[in-house]
Amino acid sequence: MQSQILAATTLIAGLTGVSAVAQAAPACEPAKLAQKYPSLAGRTIKVGADPQTPPYAMRDGADFNKVIGSDVDLAHAVLDCAGIKHEMFLGGWSGLMPATAGGQVDIFWDNLYYTPERAKQLDYVMYMQAATGALTQAGNPKKITSIETSCGATYAVGLGTVEEVAAKKQDAACKAESKPGITIMTYPDMAAGIRLVQSGRADIMMTDLAVVDQLAADNPKTYERAYKILTGFNIGAAVKKGNADLLNAIRDGLEVIQADSQQKAIFAKYKIDADMQVPAAVRTE
């Protein structure tokens, strides 16, 4: 009987060991690039970002030719993990989506919110959740404390963004209550939106919360955050529809750097709340 118990115990331990090996944490395998992602072997991948979207992508203050930021660092970590050669492709934010859908850019990796409409053009790998911030001049001259108190204000929003949708929705709500509507101005890139607030042409610029907080922290005499909205939206890196190898390489790499806390370390470096990380997941529709 004792020998039977011992044998059973040994078998269970052996099976547990096999299970533990099977569930081992993912690891980087750059030497297996051609085996795992054959269409990427020998290629240099272009990573699209707007260098005026801090803290996600921005010029290094010590070296103008160097681009840094949380999304830039994530892209480097993930692509290095897979052994993929890559380079940054810099441009205005609103132009990077059509450039990616058209194949001029391989990955759009710069604070890109997921929407079903965008997923008709691009495939996503999610890694972060989002919140929206409202940037205004220091002192908040119009005393705007929420989007609901914005009737009669002028808003600057990114062209084609979820913030544009939110501003239009509130404009309609204001008018339905017989209040002045919201004047909506769209901007093609972050720098243009910031100038609208700085010059006083816009009372509020709506954009990502981390961007707003970074601008306010770096320029406290010029800007402040009027309010924030927890949106529930997810943010991801995106590729042209059907580019399965690249999509899988991004997902696999993100799983590795999330498992070993590299992503949280990058977030901490750029003062992004660690709770904004979400498990890597592919979305194609």
Name these PLM-found stretches.
Residues 94-98, 111-120, 166-170, 196-231:
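A ligand-binding cleft/hinge motif common to bilobed small-molecule-binding domains
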Residues 76, 85-149:
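Acidic, polar ligand-binding/catalytic clefts
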Residues 25-31, 72-81, 140, 148, ...:
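Extended ligand-binding regions for polar small-molecule ligands
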Residues 51-54, 64-80, 112, 133-189, ...:
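Bilobed "Venus flytrap"/periplasmic-binding protein-like clamshell domains
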Residues 70-72, 87-98, 142, 183-195, ...:
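Short helix-initiation/N-cap motifs at beta->coil->alpha
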Residues 129-136, 213, 217-255, 272-285:
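Periplasmic-binding protein-like
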Residues 25-111:
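Extracytoplasmic small-molecule ligand-binding "clamshell" domains
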Residues 25-35, 85, 162-182, 225, ...:
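Ligand-binding clefts/hinges and TM-proximal coupling segments of bilobed small-molecule sensing domains
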